[in-house]
């Protein structure tokens, strides 16, 4: 009887361990080769569907500052790499997790002489959508404008980026939104309040 109980207990424990391991792996954001995205590495962000545009980059919308976050027009463009900085890193702080607030920063200098962090900008009067720009948010959105999060899609390895910094401020009520494209005057800008844009992360 004790032998049967022991075997049954071992089987249950094995299933529990498998569940925990699978859940833990699912918490990590994966790059295009299935490896966890790490905060100290550089990555290109690009759409899953290549005819939607190329890699992410900084775009001059109207020859003025700040620069906007956008996409290269085609997959042939070099684009700019980014680094991810989690708001609340875990003990394994180098790994980026889904549904957690983080900062996204282009690893490049800006002609505007300012931070190259992604930031939630003002609502565009023509499209009614909130644009993603670069710079440090000191007041516009309660200092929460620099925090985004990577969320899963039904397809493994494909993600959306959202602005919804509820980890930074759990008691705040935000008008959350998902990043999508906005085509304007031959340029591709990134903005909220459209359909979700599936993205992947390609290590440099």
From Swiss-Prot:
Disulfide connectivity for this sequence is 65-112, 164-176, 169-172
Tell me which UniProt keywords the record has, alphabetically.
Answer: Apoplast, Disulfide bond, Glycoprotein, Protease inhibitor, Secreted, Serine protease inhibitor, Signal
One Pfam family assigned to this protein is Kunitz_legume
What the record says about the induction of its expression is:
Accumulates in roots during colonization by arbuscular mycorrhizal (AM) fungi (e.g. Rhizophagus irregularis).
Which tissues does it occur in? Expressed at low levels in non-mycorrhizal roots.
Q: Which GO terms describe its cellular component?
A: apoplast; extracellular space
User: Mind telling me which residues the site (Important in determining the strength and specificity of the interaction with its subsrate) is annotated on?
Assistant: 173
UniProt-annotated glycosylation sites, renumbered to this chain: 62, 141
Q: Where in the cell is the protein located?
A: Secreted; Secreted, Extracellular space, Apoplast
GO MF, one example: serine-type endopeptidase inhibitor activity
Q: Which InterPro entries match?
A: Kunitz_inhibitor_STI-like_sf, Prot_inh_Kunz-lg
Signal peptide (UniProt feature, chain positions): 1-26
Give the UniProt record's GO annotations in the biological process aspect. arbuscular mycorrhizal association; response to symbiotic fungus
* Function as written in the Swiss-Prot or TrEMBL entry: Protease inhibitor that, together with SCP1, controls mycorrhiza establishment and arbuscule development during root colonization by arbuscular mycorrhizal (AM) fungi (e.g. Rhizophagus irregularis), probably by degrading SCP1 in the apoplast of the periarbuscular region.
Q: Which PANTHER family match?
A: KUNITZ TRYPSIN INHIBITOR 2 (PTHR33107), KUNITZ TYPE TRYPSIN INHIBITOR 104 (PTHR33107:SF31)
The family line of this record is: Belongs to the protease inhibitor I3 (leguminous Kunitz-type inhibitor) family.
| Quaternary structure note | Interacts with SCP1 and CP.
Q: How is this protein named in the record?
A: Kunitz type trypsin inhibitor 106
Q: Which organism is it from?
A: Medicago truncatula
Q: What gene does the UniProt entry assign to this protein? A: KPI106
